[in-house]
Regions:
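Residues lining hydrophobic/aromatic ligand-binding pockets adjacent to catalytic sites
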Residues: 1-300
Length: 300
């Protein structure tokens, strides 16, 4: 059998870019199908409470929602998933944690069938937080996206009480301007639990906090390189993403480093805490998430 040709670095990059281009084209088609599904759902639910099917019920949702940013990592097979077959990985993850932050929807707009799979595979009470499609945040950058946001938010109608937050992550090149702040807040569906994560430090300012508080939009606090290291509270609930302190995704948090955030959250008086660990290297995320949850429960 002939050996596969070894691709150069440039060829591998071109191949990846081609895949991404195809995926982005598919996202447009999937968004159109979700749009039709949302309109049909709204026709059937015209007489229902407009907040029906909204994210997990505030009365029954646990106060601490702590988990990882994704669960299907091949490099966890020798750590978190040791001796567990791949088909059982989600079952194992959901037995250890009550929530997951899904990153895949950022790259691939979910189909209705995909969302139904999420529902089927999850145990009762398990909560999904969903990262919003790059079509909205990175390609269109909140320009002419009101309908797209509503269409993507239809996922919450499908998940019902298994829905947590929608996390909108903006790129590092997207720096603060008053116009961009207005674009974001005017395009969000404020019947949902919205979280916005910025990767440019200019967004850490009082004008942003004031506008977020007015709309009850959650400002995502970040533990990440070159970003302000502080907890920002703009709603009754707080949301923190742990990416790593000096290096993205590769930092193993010490107990002391986690405790700094526990104390900040405790001092904030937040009604609910959403915390997701994105430092997936070497399975650090699962270990750190468990330790963080233990500490924050102990602090109350």
């Amino acid at each position: 059998m002939a050996e596969k040709p070894v691709l150069t670095k440039e060829e591998r990059r071109a191949k990846r870019e081609k895949r991404r281009e195809i995926q982005r084209e598919q996202n447009v088609g999937r968004a159109e199908k979700m749009h039709k599904a949302r309109l049909e759902f709204e026709r059937q639910e015209e007489s229902a409470d407009p907040l029906q099917g909204l994210e997990g019920d505030h009365e029954t949702l646990p106060q601490y929602q702590v988990g990882c940013s994704g669960w299907y990592y091949w490099h966890w097979r020798d750590h978190f998933y040791k001796d567990i077959p791949g088909k059982d990985w989600f079952k194992h993850y959901s037995a250890e944690f009550e929530t997951v932050e899904l990153n895949a929807p950022f790259y691939s707009w979910p189909t209705i069938a995909t969302v139904k799979t999420w529902i089927r595979q999850a145990r009762p009470g398990f909560i999904y937080t969903v990262k919003v499609s790059e079509l909205i945040t990175h390609i269109k950058r909140f320009k002419g996206t009101k309908t797209l946001v509503k269409d993507f938010s239809h996922i919450a109608d499908l998940l019902g009480n298994q829905m947590g937050c929608f996390i909108f992550q903006l790129p590092p090149s997207y720096h603060y301007t008053p116009g961009r702040l207005k674009d974001i807040l005017s395009h969000l569906d404020h019947t949902r639990r919205n979280v916005v994560e910025f990767r440019h430090a200019s967004w850490w300012n009082e004008d942003v906090y004031k506008a977020f508080r007015k709309t009850k939009t959650i400002f995502c606090s970040c533990s990440g390189p070159r970003l302000p290291d502080e907890l920002i509270k703009t709603a009754d609930e707080v949301y923190v993403r742990f990416h790593g302190i000096k290096r993205w995704y590769r930092h193993d948090y010490t107990d002391e480093e986690l405790n700094v955030w526990v104390q900040r959250i405790r001092a904030s008086g937040a009604e609910r805490v959403w915390a997701y660990f994105n430092n997936d290297f070497d399975g650090y995320a699962t270990k750190n998430a468990k330790e963080f949850l233990k500490q924050i429960k102990k602090s109350t």
